[in-house]
Amino acid sequence: MSCAAPLPSTAMAATVMITGANSGIGLEFATQYATKGWTVIATHRRAEPPKSLTDLASRFNKVRIESLDVTNVEQVRGLATKLSDVPIDVLINNAGVYNDRSKCAGDDEACPGDWTVESFGNLKYPLLDTILAVNVKGPLIVSECFYKNVQASTLKKIVAISSSNGSLTGKSGPPPGAIFYRLSKAALNREMQLVAEATRKDGVTVVMLNPGPTLTERQEYLHGYAGMLKTSFTVENMIKTIDKVTIMDTGRFLRYDGVTEPW
């Protein structure tokens, strides 16, 4: 499948594209990169641009807001065509689904959602389809459709935001259960390993990052729990790790601070 025409190699200021950039880790990535002077392509899947991103764009004139449902192949192709002349130095696959948010208001980013439907004996399988579509299918579609943009850039990096819950040896994580979320992150890791193998020849670096137990809007109910990390801290460290990785690191699964995570 070819999602966009080949690009000329053009020297430009560094550009990052972030999926799911309207809240949590994605919004923090957008904010910190914008603060550094990068051009930021911040995507969201809402009908209208969310206030979080319009506020950011009002502060930084190099923030570009785009609507994108990462599970919709035609929509991703359409945006790739629209941005076909834009080299993307760092492509961050951040959009993700963690649990059942069917009872949350569409714009309520603080709603924690429901983990109980991901416990064995109480599994709700339509949710599995949603989680796999966003967490596994989405990053693959986005990485392929925007590959020429990455290839045409100076830095040539693809990042997938994963989780220690994708580790086959890991035992820590969200409340008991979360079967769908855990298996989606394991699949994401293997998927990105394969992407790394396929793109190494082009000098593209692909890594998976575990942000750790991050206190985003949806985890505010965990405020005060030992070990929870501020979003600003994890993102600051992930950016440092992204800066440091090279083609020698492609295919690796790393913690936010660059430490190797177990598969």
Task: Go through the PLM ranges and name each one.
Residues I18-T19, N93-N94, K157-S163, T205-N210:
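Structural signature of the Rossmann-like NAD(P)-dependent dehydrogenase/reductase core
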Residues N22, G26-T31:
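N-terminal Rossmann NAD(P)H-binding glycine-rich loop of SDR-like oxidoreductase domains
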Residues K36-K51:
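Conserved glycine-rich Rossmann-like NAD(P)H-binding loop of the short-chain dehydrogenase/reductase
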Residues A57-E74:
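Rossmann-fold cofactor-recognition segment
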Residues T71-P87:
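Conserved Rossmann-fold cofactor-binding substructure of NAD(P)-dependent oxidoreductases
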Residues V97-L132, K137-I141, Y147-R200:
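Catalytic loop of short-chain dehydrogenase/reductase
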Residues R101, S167-K171, L209-L222:
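Short beta-loop-alpha junction of Rossmann-like oxidoreductase domains
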Residues K201, M208, T216, E220-W263:
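C-terminal helical subdomain
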